[in-house]
C-alpha cells in the first residue's frame, strides 16, 4: 500500500490526482474538520496563517463527497479521508459516502486549537478513545484507519497501537516521528511484532531506499507527505 498522507489545506482531489502517475494507490483527502467544535478551531488556525480545509457544517460532507467523486471518476486508487471531530458520529457519516473507501481518525494533528478539544494527538490521552474507535468500527460503511503520532510525551505508543488493533480497525497509520532522529524504525518494528493490524509507516520517506527501509522494519505499507507536498515526487513508486 503506497499512500499519499493527509496534509491540511493541500490534499484535495486536484492535488492528489497529480500524484497518481508516481505509483500511489491510496489517496488521502484532508484532514477535514467535521463538527462544530473543530470547524471553529479551524477558523482560528486559519487566522494565524495556516492552511486548512474548513467548510461550514452544512456543506462539509457534500464537499468531501465531491472531492472523493472527482478521484473515483479519474482513477482506480482507494480514497481515504482523514477526519477531525470531537465525537465519532461525523466519522461514521463520512463513511456512508459511497466513493470513500477508508475513513481515518486523526490522532495526529498538533495544532493547539484542536488539542484543546481533545482532538489530534490528544485523542491518545482521552479515556474514551477505545469507545470512540470501536463505535466507528462497528458502524462504519467503509474501512477504518487510525493515524497516530509516535513518541508523544505521556503516551505509550505500543499501548495505543494495541488498543487500535483490539478495536478492530483495518489500518494503523503511524507517523514514526522521533525528535532529531528521523523515522523511528525500531518502533515500527516493535509495533509490527506486537500487533496483527495492517501497519502503514510514515515519516521522513524521501527515496525508494527509505520506502524499503520502512517495509523492512515491519510496515505493511507506507505513506509520504512532505516529499510530495509540491505535487511532484522525485522518485517513482512504480519501481517497488
PLM regions and their residue ranges:
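Hydrophobic faces of well-ordered beta-strands that scaffold small-molecule active sites
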Residues: 2-6, 25-30, 79-83, 103-105, ...
